[in-house]
Every structure is written in structure tokens, then in C-alpha cells.
Amino acid sequence: MMAMNAKQPFGMHPVLQEPKFSSLHSGSEAMRRVCLPAPQLQGNIFGSFDESLLARAEALAAVDIVSHGKNHPFKPDATYHTMSSVPCTSTSPTVPISHPAALTSHPHHAVHQGLEGDLLEHISPTLSVSGLGAPEHSVMPAQIHPHHLGAMGHLHQAMGMSHPHAVAPHSAMPACLSDVESDPRELEAFAERFKQRRIKLGVTQADVGAALANLKIPGVGSLSQSTICRFESLTLSHNNMIALKPVLQAWLEEAEAAYREKNSKPELFNGSERKRKRTSIAAPEKRSLEAYFAIQPRPSSEKIAAIAEKLDLKKNVVRVWFCNQRQKQKRMKYSAVH
């Protein structure tokens, strides 16, 4: 019987070494080592009997915990087993153990363990971006308290909120530009400036309206003369003034560029300018030319140049006038004969 009692605890231990009650077995083993010395060292003949009593007490306690765990899913011993399984050596120096409750059985640790895993998936990229380093996943749940996770959650939220402020100045720039363009005083100043430049270029309002179609602006065709007139007189609606301003500004820039190019190369435009523009001679210069024509109807080229210089006229203008005057005299003589 002594041999049977001595073998009985060893028959019970494989059942108690299941992963579900490994923490209870380790706790009872620690209690046995502290409270009871080894039977072979004590030399007690009832050592094996004490071992069997302790084994039966462990089995009853295990059954009680299993029945209690069905009603209450929270297991402090399982939590303690999870916490005690973490090695004491620091494997991640970047995250120090600052909370003492992280190494003990915290009452709410097992409840929030799944939540911590989800939060760490979102926080770990933030830590790597901010330069804190990403620790190992097996050590993080045991070393970070839920309160620490809340603080890092606020840090992640603050980092996420920092991006709109960085973009805010860029998004505010178009609003400032639109305010400047929609200012009535700016529109009035541009309308007056446009009118003065148009007159200086020698272009009519109708020419401006017809030339807008040549700009190839999407949605913009030729406009009537009355529309350009109403823009210069500020009688259009405010929205139409705002919409028409960039179109007229584009035309004005192109017209001034063409005008500057024509002035820089006048020899390319003399022929077309002579056909398009008609010269008018004032009355005093006309009387002087008639006096020269009465003296010499066919002056030489040198005489024409001298007359043009004296009257402050172009040589070509004086030459054409003498030619036209001779044709006029021929018509008068022909009509008088017939």
C-alpha cells in the first residue's frame, strides 16, 4: 500500500500539467517547496500520504476553478501565467518598464488584452515614424499599461491633426487671390487702365470684341461692342465683371506684345501700314505744296526731299501729293476741252 500511495501523486501530475492549469500547478509547487521539506530529506514515513492529500486538494481546486471559470471568463491565474511568461531580461531597451502594475496581475489587464493588440497595430507605425522605434510585439503587451496606450493614442491623434494645419496656408492662398480679384476697387482700376491702353493702341471696342475669338480660350467667343462698352463703364453685373476681367487682360497682354514687336521692326509693317492708314495734310502745309506745284509741277527727288524737310512731312507723302495733283490737273483740262 505504501508503494501504491507513493505512485499515486505521479499518476495525478500529468493531468495537472495541462496548459489550462499550469499556473495553478506552479503555484502549488512553489507553496510545497516553501512550506514542506522534501520527504526523502525529512525521513517522514507519512511523506507519500501527505503527497497524495496535496494532490487530491489540487485536483479539487482545479475542478472548482473550472466550474467558476465557466460563469466568469476572467482568470487571474491565467493572466498571472501570461505575465510571468515574459522574460525578466530587457529585450527592447526603447520601451522602459515604468509601471509596476505591468508585471503583476492587474485586474483589467486580461479584459483589455485584445484591445491592446489592436491599438498596437495602429500605434507601432506612428512610433516608427516619430523616431521612437518599433519594439517586438511579444514584449509590448506585457510592458505597456492601458493608460500608456491611451497617452500614445492621444499622441497619434495629435500627429494626425498636425497635417491639416500644414496644408492650411496653401488652401488659404486661392481664397485671398479671389478676394483681391473680386474687389470692386480693383475691378474699377482695371477697367480704367484697360480703356486707356486700348485707346493708346488705336483699337476700337468692336475690334476688341471680335479679337477675343482669336485667343482660343475655351468657352469664350467674340463679344459685342456694347459688352466691352459696359465693362469699361462699369455697368455690367459684378459676376460678369469678374468673369470678363481675365479674358480682357489676356487680350491686352497679347495686343501690347504685338505692338512692341511692330515698333521694334517697323520695316516689316511699312507696306501694310501705307495701305491701311490714310495721311491727312493740314491746311498750311497744303497751301505751301500748292505754291511749290505752281512753280514746278514735276520736282526732282532732291527738291521733294527739301520740301518734305521744310514742311516737316515725310518724303513719300510729298511725292504722292505731287503725283495726285498732276492727275487732278489732267482731269480738269480734259473736262474743259470736252
Swiss-Prot record:
Record Pfam families: Homeodomain, Pou
Keywords: Activator, Cytoplasm, Differentiation, DNA-binding, Homeobox, Nucleus, Transcription, Transcription regulation
GO terms, molecular function: DNA-binding transcription activator activity, RNA polymerase II-specific; DNA-binding transcription factor activity; RNA polymerase II cis-regulatory region sequence-specific DNA binding; sequence-specific DNA binding
Primary localization: nucleus
Extent of the signal sequence: none
Ranges of the DNA-binding region feature: 274-333
InterPro entries: HD, Homeobox_CS, Homeodomain-like_sf, Lambda_DNA-bd_dom_sf, POU, POU_dom, POU_domain_TF
Record domain POU-specific: where: 179-256
Residues spanned by motif POU-IV box: 56-65
Gene3D superfamilies: Homeodomain-like (1.10.10.60), lambda repressor-like DNA-binding domains (1.10.260.40)
Subcellular location: Nucleus; Cytoplasm
Distribution of this protein across tissues and organs: Brain.
KW Cytoplasm (keyword) present: yes
Disruption phenotype: Mutants are deaf and show deficits in balance and coordination that become severe at about P14 and exhibit hyperactivity by 5-6 weeks.
Biological processes per GO annotation: axon extension; inner ear auditory receptor cell differentiation; inner ear development; inner ear morphogenesis; inner ear receptor cell differentiation; neuromuscular process controlling balance; neuron apoptotic process; positive regulation of transcription by RNA polymerase II
PROSITE patterns documented for this protein: HOMEOBOX_1, HOMEOBOX_2, POU_1, POU_2, POU_3
Assembly and binders: Interacts with ISL1.
Role: Acts as a transcriptional activator. Acts by binding to sequences related to the consensus octamer motif 5'-ATGCAAAT-3' in the regulatory regions of its target genes. Involved in the auditory system development, required for terminal differentiation of hair cells in the inner ear.
Family of the protein in this entry: Belongs to the POU transcription factor family. Class-4 subfamily.
Protein's recorded name: POU domain, class 4, transcription factor 3
Organism: Mus musculus
